[in-house]
Amino acid sequence: MPSTGTLVIIFAIVLILCIMLLFFYKTVEAEKPGVLPPPIPPPTPPPSKKKYDHNEYMEKTDLEPEVKKNHRKWANEAEHLISSSVKGLENLDETAFLANHKGHGFRTFEHAKSLFKEFLKKY
């Protein structure tokens, strides 16, 4: 039986031959002997997003002409109603609120105020 040193040398030679064979097949795959295939190019950056244009969007939508004409006015009215509701909520008397909203799921006046403000932040 061969010694351990001989086995190590044989194993090293076989390993080197395997690596050389692998390198040979890699270069033949590239159809140019001795040259490795070119590296993969970096990914191209995504195209820049177009800035949102509300007027262009409104032209493309299939809304009724009255809606297209009045949507800004209605949005301003809704914003005014919301802001006046916030002011009204801040000035509302706590006892009157609790008397009117008993059993509606509000724990306290502050709880209702915080829920309403969370709703306004979302929308």
Curated annotation (Swiss-Prot):
Please report the name of this protein according to its UniProt entry.
Answer: Uncharacterized protein CP123L
TM stretches of this protein = 5-25
Q: Which GO terms describe its cellular component?
A: host cell membrane; membrane; virion component
User: Which portions of the sequence form the region Disordered?
Assistant: 33-54
From the UniProt record, list the coiled-coil ranges.
none
The places in or outside the cell where this protein is found are: Host membrane; Virion
List the source organism: African swine fever virus (strain Badajoz 1971 Vero-adapted) (Ba71V)
Identify the domain of life.
Viruses
Q: What induces it?
A: Expressed in the late phase of the viral replicative cycle.
Q: How does it sit in the membrane?
A: Single-pass membrane protein
For this UniProt record, the keywords arranged alphabetically read as follows: Host membrane, Late protein, Membrane, Transmembrane, Transmembrane helix, Virion
- Reply yes or no: does the keyword Signal apply: no
